[in-house]
Amino acid sequence: MRAVHIHLPNFGPELEDAVIREFAAVYPGHDWFFVRYWLGGPHVRIRTVDSGDAVELLALARQAFDSIVPQGNPELDQDAYLDAVRDLATAGEGGIAIDPGDLRPAGVYPAPYVPEYERYGGAAGFDTITRVFTHSSAIALRALAHDAVTPNIRMNAALLYVLRVMSDYAREFGREEACALAEAGRAFWHRQLSGERAGSGARVPVSESAVAKAAGLVRDLRAAGPGAFDVLAPGPADITELLRGWNPQRRHGILISIIHMHNNRLGCGGRPEYALFHLVSHVMNTGREQ
């Protein structure tokens, strides 16, 4: 496994999208995945399964960076960086705040890859989670293929992915368990928003028309048969294999993380995910009542 970080001069999903598309165009393979991150400044983290030439990977990443980021582009300074990431750093990981540290200048940097074994069920599942992430990245790239990716494109792609995940999860573990997963995701993001000073009673409004539209989509897909989901968003490979053998609470944690990483790749991770899980919870429970 090799890794490289492409640091950008400013925050914004559009610039990240462009660099990701360019790297995908120059990298000669599909055995890689990416995440967006903020610590040390806005950047894209590239991980390749191939453990070959690290110098070549750096060169390709620099090629993507140089093609997209203009020379002399104004960059964040330390104060602007700290202001931009304050809420994220305060919310932290697992309720523990993160020190945002110093801003790193825009450019390409080699980086070690440290797998988050515990988050995804242990070292035994490492090969499986790698396949899930490369598959997720390939799906996300389809949504990011446009020069102008709107918020609606991002959220529609996120909704299709999570509905497919829920469909597979319900088939494997039962509908009641899938409803519990949707509610666990909504509750998790409510806690995260509260940590970001949104207020302990904060609620993200979800319109009734949006709920009705999503519920209608689910009904139409069910009526069309199991192949319909494959047309819209191919099922995340190996996810159910990864989850077998864990109790429901652990399965929920692993799957919420997998969904979050997919949304991150789409550029709609974080705050929008509360609305997404609220919507999916609504849809799942509406279907249960019918």
How should these model regions be labeled?
Residues M1-Q290:
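An acidic, charge-biased composition feature
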